[in-house]
Amino acid sequence: MKKILAVIAASVYLMSPSANAQTITGAGATFPYPVYSKWSEAYQVKTDIQLNYQSIGSSGGIKQIKAATVDFGATDAPLKGEELTASGLVQFPTVLGGVVPIINIEGIKPGELQLTGDVLAKIFVGHIVVWNDKRIQELNPKLKLPDANITIVHRADGSGTTFIFTDYLSEVSTVWKEEVGKGAAVKWPATSSVAGKGNEGVAANVARVKNSIGYVEYAYAKKNKMTYAKLQNRDGKYVDPDDLTFAAAAAGADWFSTPGMGISLVNQKGAQSWPITGATFILMYREPKNAKNSQETIKFFDWAFVNGGKLAADLDYVPLPKAVTDRIRSDVWTQIKK
């Protein structure tokens, strides 16, 4: 719990700027906060450029960039082409990661509980309400699951992590698609539920509430040593979340088929694919108010694309393919006025 609270406390200022450091500002998704933090620390050592990133959720990041109060917004729920055009924004991905179900069931270790997408959806929609429900028990015949009510933990804020998670549930469950649907914020149907702000808040609540289940970006689960569930993927294989299964899900992605590269990576084919994989995105103005800071923002992410791969991989994020970063340099950043 102390580690989770430490992440929350650190979520506004990534490092303390030196007296002469230039500061670039961003706000939005909590999904990439751990890797942006590591990139910022390393980049400031090299350049003395300070990144002030507010980890406030994707919806907040979109609002902040549209209000022109930050140099960039960050979202895991990509904007569509028409919204980008209408807002005068460009969009590009920075890194890939996975969303994982996390649980707090006494005696259950990470990866021991196995769930299908359909059963996961039925839990979150409120059709399965106890852990020893036969539909869960049949998937886990060797586990002794408690006769205890399930508490759902979800995001309180508009969230790209929620967008990725509900996008997946909509892909694998007709019931979820018809009753709830996908979005950065949805009306959660389960009656026994607790809301948390940010990935940090969801992780903290799952750690606190016995017999609960929630969803977070994998780096939060790993950092806080939380128990995750294995998921059955589209090929019928049960897989663990890690950088290899996230990369497998993105292997066949057609990045250039959608404006702003806003593709969905959930429920992809492949025996090794993690089914709840997603990219996180940056939003910037084509004609920024502060051109100098916009160019420094570009330099920061360019440095990260070249030098930040190991830092990302250490946190089980997946760096973008070179073809994607090359296209970002040639087709996206060139649209931003200097």
PLM region spans:
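Sec-dependent signal peptide recognition
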Residues: 2-8, 17
